[in-house]
Amino acid sequence: MEDGYGINLVPLASFAIETYANDPCQCFRVHAQEDSDLREVSLNMKMHKAIAIIQFKLEGQVIKRRPEFNMDKRLLLDKIDYEEGTIMIEGKKYELLDKSFPTIDPNNPYELSEAEEALMNRLCMNFLNCDKLQEHIRFLFNKGGLYLCYNSNLLYHGCVPLDEKGNFRKVKIGSKQYSGKELYDVLEYYARKGYYEQDNREEHCLLYTSDAADEGL
């Protein structure tokens, strides 16, 4: 991000160093060259953990606001016993590999800390004010799409929801259900509406579109 778009990640680095100073963050290892500077690798792991925890919190807030997304299984921070260092999933208790969560309030695990809130405000401003990044995003929306028929081939983003028999599975969005091409059309409609109109509901649908692709809906 810094080399390609000139986006300042120093605020994230500073936050990570201060918050996880004595945490090796081994569970958040990132791909690195064999000859990489160990100090840089260590910093990258701290930054990875810092932004990952923030991501889990913000995703949780959206899921709680939009129960129709049916993504409650992604709500994990409230399933953790922070004193024991365990998590309860589908009635079974598992020990966590990483037990250090200094920014999580066990009574309100999806709320950003003041420092996290300030960090995200700065990062959002940096991303929104990056002319080069915004130019590339506009290009993607102007020229791209969720699917394309090209050279007798169907190219599509993410994955197509299917049922056990291999037929298109219906997915509920709003008050209606969609499947196959119709599903992709409505997701693209909301993605474009969210980008061009900057409406909060469609903005959250952009996150849903991304998560849905990851989950296979």
Residue ranges and their predicted role:
Residues 216-217:
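N-terminal low-complexity segments that are often proline-rich with Ser/Thr-Pro
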Residues 1-212:
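Feature recognizes metal-dependent phosphohydrolase scaffolds
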